[in-house]
Amino acid sequence: MQKLPAHPEVKENLGRLREAGVRLAALTNSTQQLADAQIDSSGLREYFDQVLSADTVRRLKPAPEPYRMAAENLGVEVGQVRLVAAHAWDVTGAMQAGCSAALVARPSMVLNPLFERPDVVGGDLREVADGILEAEK
């Protein structure tokens, strides 16, 4: 798991979000050491202001504490955070913690019909970035 490559459209669209003034942080259930290794091996470190581990608060996502910790580390209210994830459970956890959310709905990823739908859903990060930039207007 330490050397997973990013999907082809990821770098370009993280760059688009940064250029538009969106602050980016990575939040993972991995340990900080593994999170740092993953972000470095993927070549994505330059796009993120922070790389955060849920391990810091000793509660894993989808518990609310990791999302709240991310907001605190960014110096914003939890309602100002938008989690972008490829897993419906992560999106649901973020929304239940008070965040906005976006789902990268790659093939086989589906939303849980029992939970609220995030305001941005796209088939890849390009579509999600388009939706975020439109929502931020």
Task: Pin down the residues of each PLM region.
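Asp-based, Mg2+/Mn2+-dependent phosphohydrolase catalytic module
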Residues: 15-18, 31-32, 36-137
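Short, acidic loop-to-helix structural element flanking the phosphoryl-transfer center
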Residues: 1-26, 36
